[in-house]
Amino acid sequence: MHYRDLPEYTDDDFQHIDLIPFDWVHFEARDGSETTRMIRRIRESRLDLPCSVEVEKPRPGIEAVFAGATLLIFSRAYAGHHEFDTPHPFLLRMREQALQADLIVTWGNEGAYGLDRRRAIHHSPAYPPIEVKDTLGAGDTFNAGLIDAYIRGLGMAEALPHACRLAGNKCGQIGLEGLGGDIATKPG
């Protein structure tokens, strides 16, 4: 459920969470200063805990979150705001701001592109369903597919097609019930 008037989660809220049981933490980058403080807390208490950040829109101070992330997921709109109309140059520019992170940019019907920490470029095509039934949550489903693949120890070459297939499956059904099926156990 999406509710626009819900207040943003703050670092004060985040301080009450015990990070020990978590395998991964994911943020949507909305408030740069709050998200940066939360990521800093993760890095101070659980250096081993992977942390991903989705960056959809340009927002004041958002680039500050890049330094602490393990995985950065950008939108094509964000790349376009920075005057990039192709994914590779955008990813290379973002690499300058986030040397430690794997970088992903979604590119609509072309799928998604990535630049891993070894500077290897990866691509997965989109996997559109035969019939589009519901796109609500497809982006979050893509993110979940990436995180799922990474948690299972897969690299970007496997994670990108896994996430693209999962997002395509989501668009081909209404809601999230039963999403994945075989794809949940067989990435790529």
Regions found by a protein language model. Give the residues of each.
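Ribokinase/PfkB-type carbohydrate-kinase core domain
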Residues: M1-I121
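Conserved phosphate-binding/catalytic region of the ribokinase-like
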Residues: P87-G188
